[in-house]
């Protein structure tokens, strides 16, 4: 096969349709089972849910997965509006009052009983914040706000508390926070290809420019079972960050954003406006299907918890120079913990309708326990299930099933003020107000006022903020509208 032909090859995954339509009785039963996790692990005093079964701690990422589960439970008829409202009111009230790391952003972890800051051993104290976790939370707060505008005021008040001074810079780079040996905050760039861009979409939905975080570069291509899979080419040895390639961020972007840009309000399920996210997702999927076809090993790779030490691993398609690398966050190679991730399997099933994902559904359908939800995964080596239950796994499974019924989970409310469903946004009106004393100190984004905001300002005598000087002009390599040239998808061993 000539190089040109290789470059023009289309992966089979690109032709697989997504699954859309009402849930079957079988699929609805899976949704009901997944929701049981959030019944068993709910903390009524705070409205939070344990990230791991019977362990009273959570993160912003896992709490966003709870919002996904809560939305799916209501939309799929598992709970009614009263139950949904009561849970969401309590959750948002807690999120609006939790102590923040350095009075800036949500801490990396909270005790679900007390809603106080804790470390990863659930001991009181603050340890930093994660821009990746917060990006997922921002995305789900936006979904809640758009789907249920009656809660928009509560959602906006949550985000208006946050000080974005250190989490995002003028070039659109996302940073996390840690504490040094003297308990002083240290801010470092956070995120690698896939996770970084997924989190950036959450910030974009609130008006932030995430130019550096949202671009695919720098990346290289790994030849994995005939598929050229993109991976982040920043050196893990010098950056102390592993370049995990996992299913999860690509699946989540597909389920929640429809592989669209953050400003795409189209309801067309067949079109995907993001310039490369679907293409890269197809590659990550295809490498896993090809692995099954070539080796006979069912594959659905993602990060997951364990029921034994080391308790958490990144189970990857590629990481740190190796295909199918299963490592801890410290980089220790632990191949015996490789597993079929249930959330990855069901997410792939929703986004790629194929005989392979049919088989994945068959193997995971009953992999759970009554009142606990679904297992975290099934060991690839045949050692049985990972007998651990988590909010993230069950939450993503629920949103995958909701995607089948409703399509893209982010559904914008109308921005037509004459429409009865229109909801004015406290966030937007605060951001355009030149007299608000926290807009600049909290590094809130500048948004261009639309007709509704201009009209509101004229009616109330509020002066509009002027566009700031081009702070991002010092970032010449980053252009939001830069054209994207997709790399070749396959090597010569894949037949056209």
Describe every region a protein language model picked out.
Residues 1-487, 493-496:
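Ser/Thr/Asn(+Pro)-rich, low-complexity disordered segments
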């Amino acid at each position: 096969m000539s190089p040109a032909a290789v470059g023009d090859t289309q992966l089979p995954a690109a032709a697989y349709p997504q699954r859309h339509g009402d849930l079957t009785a079988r699929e609805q039963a899976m949704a009901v089972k997944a929701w049981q996790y959030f019944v068993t692990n709910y903390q009524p005093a705070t409205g939070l849910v344990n990230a791991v079964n019977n362990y009273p701690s959570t993160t912003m990422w896992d709490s966003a997965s709870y919002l996904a589960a809560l939305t799916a439970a209501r939309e799929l008829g598992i709970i009614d509006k009263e139950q949904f409202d009561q849970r969401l009111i309590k959750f948002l009230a807690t999120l609006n009052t939790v102590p923040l790391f350095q009075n800036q952003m949500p801490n990396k972890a909270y005790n679900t009983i007390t809603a106080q800051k804790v470390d990863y051993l659930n001991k009181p104290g603050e340890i930093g914040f994660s821009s990746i976790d917060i990006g997922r939370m921002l995305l789900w707060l936006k979904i809640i706000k758009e789907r249920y505008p009656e809660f928009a005021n509560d959602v906006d008040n949550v985000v208006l508390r946050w000080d974005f001074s250190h989490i995002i810079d003028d070039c659109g780079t996302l940073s996390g926070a840690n504490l040094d040996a003297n308990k002083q905050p240290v801010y470092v760039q956070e995120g690698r290809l896939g996770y970084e861009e997924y989190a950036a979409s959450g910030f974009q939905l609130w008006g932030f420019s995430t130019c550096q975080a949202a671009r695919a570069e720098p990346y290289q291509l790994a030849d994995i079972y005939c598929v050229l899979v993109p991976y982040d080419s920043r050196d893990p040895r010098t950056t102390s960050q592993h370049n995990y390639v996992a299913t999860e961020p690509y699946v989540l972007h597909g389920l929640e954003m429809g592989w669209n840009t953050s400003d795409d309000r189209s309801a067309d399920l067949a079109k995907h406006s993001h310039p490369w996210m679907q293409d890269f997702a197809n590659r990550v999927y295809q490498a896993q299907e090809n692995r099954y076809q070539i080796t006979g090993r069912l594959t659905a790779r993602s990060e997951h918890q364990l029921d034994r030490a080391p308790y958490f691993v990144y189970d990857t398609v590629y990481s740190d120079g190796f295909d199918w690398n299963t490592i801890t966050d410290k980089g220790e190679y632990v191949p015996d913990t490789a597993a079929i991730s249930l959330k990855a399997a069901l997410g792939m099933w929703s986004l790629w309708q194929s005989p392979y994902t049919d088989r994945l559904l068959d193997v995971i359908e009953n992999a759970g326990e009554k009142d606990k939800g679904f297992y975290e995964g099934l060991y690839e080596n045949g050692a049985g299930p990972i007998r651990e239950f988590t909010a993230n796994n069950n939450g993503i499974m629920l949103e995958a099933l909701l995607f089948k019924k409703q399509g893209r989970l982010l559904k914008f409310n109308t921005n037509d003020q004459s429409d009865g469903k229109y909801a004015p946004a406290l966030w937007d009106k605060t951001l355009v107000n030149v007299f608000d004393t926290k807009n600049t100190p909290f590094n809130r984004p500048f948004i261009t006022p639309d007709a509704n905001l201009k009209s509101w300002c004229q009616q109330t005598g509020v002066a509009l903020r002027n566009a700031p000087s081009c702070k991002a002009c010092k970032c010449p390599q980053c252009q939001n509208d830069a054209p994207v040239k997709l790399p070749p998808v396959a090597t010569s061993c894949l037949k056209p």
